[in-house]
Every structure is written in structure tokens, then in C-alpha cells.
């Protein structure tokens, strides 16, 4: 909407992406802070509380009265702020909104099945959820390839030239990136604020890449690939950051609400999407290092138990391992935040070392 003030009335102030990104950030933050308490009251009245895994550490038992599905609120607030601030003829933005909304809807269906009395008390069956993720991922990848300026070239970090052209195989690769990132954030969302802050750090890094790649001068100077319109994604990124900060107001220790699958699946999928459009699919390993660490701990634990009948960790994901070892929840959370911050600072170095 604000961009059209520039077109209709010649208000040049609203033509700048950075200005509209700032507006979307504050709008999403304020909306989330306003609506989240109302949602918490509604969720408590409906007993929409976080289901606790029966084998989880003992200190988690007290969290079974904390509402979940907060992701629905902050995703809707982020989307509204974006619609209010971005150019709506930009396909990068529209596909990004689709990624956020579709994975949030999938997560909502799963959450609802777990907590609101649906017949399938365990939520969506894992195979059904996985198939639906692939369907959504492939649709979004096809839209990216055929309806944006994005090419199918494959890049690696710290190298300025593409390695090879993946052709139509890029569709499956992009879908895999989106799904992997989605599930990685979902696995990490096990402690108060643990997934929220690393997600914010990752989005800041990816937002910087998107803005610079959308600017002809900066992209040329930094030897970044340039795609028409990708800079506009900064508005959606800042909207989601603002919404996540608003959510963190209530999700920091001790949490008043959890994001649920409706939040973690959508945030992770969008991080994967941003990695794709900025050609940082491989650098996502560094940007989302905490998420990768959590996911690898699960893979190693399951593989070791199946092959050797022995566990590597006391419990997986790895944050539970440290809980059982006696680390306080606050200590685990803050240390993982520090790891995420350092990893993203390293990732930003890739802007110059190419």
C-alpha cells in the first residue's frame, strides 16, 4: 500500500525499500504484541496447550499448561504487514507469502490434531505430513523457476562464479532445501525462545543478502548474482523479524506461549526459501548452524541406535542432552543463541570473501 502512495501522490519517501521495510517491521511487531495476549487467553480457554512428550526431561512436565499455536498469530501479522508495505506485483514477495502461509497452515492442521480433540490425537501422520511438504515445496520451486528472474545455476559459499547449471533438477533441490529447513527449525523448537532468536539472526543475514543482490551497485561491487525484484523481499523478511520479536516478548523464559508447528514449520520453510533466492543454499548450513546441529544430533542418535543398539546422546535433539546433564534451561538457550550469532557473523563474511 505505501508504495502506491509514491505512485499516486509522488511521495518519494515511500519508494525506498528500506523505509517500507522499517514500516513492515514495526507494524508486524506492534500487531503481534497486541494480538498475542488475546490469543493466549483464547487458547487457554480452549485448552489448546502444548502436548509434552512422555519421555521428555522432567522439567518439561510443568509446560503442559502453556498454550501453543502462537505461530498462527505472528505469521498472519507478518503477512498483513507485508501486504501493507510491499509491492504486490513482485513475484518473489508473493511466493514468499505462499511459502509462509502454506507451511503455517500445514503446521496448524498438525497442531490442531494434537490438541483440539481431533480424532488423530497425534496430529498428522508423519508420512502424510512429509508428502504434503514435498507437494508444497515442489509447487513453490516451480513458481520460482518459471515466474521469477531466478536461474538454475548452483553456487557455493566464498566463490563468485556458479559451479554448474542444474536445469530442471533444481526444482527437486529447492524443494529439498525448503523441507529440510522447515523440519530443522521444527526440531529445534523445544525450549523457550530456542528456535526464535536463531531464526531472527538467520533472517537478518538473509535479508542483508537479498537487499544487496537487489541493488545493481552493491551486487556488482560484491560480485553477487543479481535478480530483478529480489530486494523487495527485504520487506517480508523484516515483517517476519518484527513478528518474531513480538512473539519473543511472550516466548522468552519462562514462556507464556509456544509457536507450535504452525510457527516452526513456516519460519523454517521461509528461511530455506530465502536461502534459495539469495543463492545461499549451501551457506544455510552456516546461517542455520544451530538448526543443523539439532537435526544432525537426531540423525546420529537414530542411526546409532539402529546400527549399534547404542545411543550417542543422553537424549536427542541435543538440547535435551544438555538438560539431562544438568544444564539450566536458560544456560542452554543463551549459549545456543551465541552459537547462532557467531555462525551468522561468519556467514556475512561470505559477502566480501568471494
UniProtKB/Swiss-Prot annotation:
One of its GO terms (molecular function) is metal ion binding. Keywords: Cell cycle, Cell division, Cell inner membrane, Cell membrane, Cell shape, Cell wall biogenesis/degradation, Magnesium, Membrane, Metal-binding, Peptidoglycan synthesis, Transferase, Transmembrane, Transmembrane helix. It comes from Campylobacter fetus subsp. fetus (strain 82-40). It comes from the Bacteria. Pathway: Cell wall biogenesis; peptidoglycan biosynthesis. Catalyzes the initial step of the lipid cycle reactions in the biosynthesis of the cell wall peptidoglycan: transfers peptidoglycan precursor phospho-MurNAc-pentapeptide from UDP-MurNAc-pentapeptide onto the lipid carrier undecaprenyl phosphate, yielding undecaprenyl-pyrophosphoryl-MurNAc-pentapeptide, known as lipid I. Its main location: membrane. Its cofactor is Mg(2+). The chain crosses the membrane at residues 1-21, 23-43, 66-86, 89-109, 130-150, 161-181, 193-213, 230-250, 257-277, 282-302, 331-351. It catalyses: UDP-N-acetyl-alpha-D-muramoyl-L-alanyl-gamma-D-glutamyl-meso-2,6-diaminopimeloyl-D-alanyl-D-alanine + di-trans,octa-cis-undecaprenyl phosphate = di-trans,octa-cis-undecaprenyl diphospho-N-acetyl-alpha-D-muramoyl-L-alanyl-D-glutamyl-meso-2,6-diaminopimeloyl-D-alanyl-D-alanine + UMP. The keyword Phosphoprotein does not apply. HAMAP family: MraY. It is found in: Cell inner membrane. GO terms for biological process: cell division; cell wall organization; peptidoglycan biosynthetic process; regulation of cell shape. Its EC number is 2.7.8.13. GO terms for cellular component: plasma membrane. This is Phospho-N-acetylmuramoyl-pentapeptide-transferase. Belongs to the glycosyltransferase 4 family. MraY subfamily. InterPro entries: Glycosyl_transferase_4, PNAcMuramoyl-5peptid_Trfase, PNAcMuramoyl-5peptid_Trfase_CS. It is a multi-pass membrane protein.
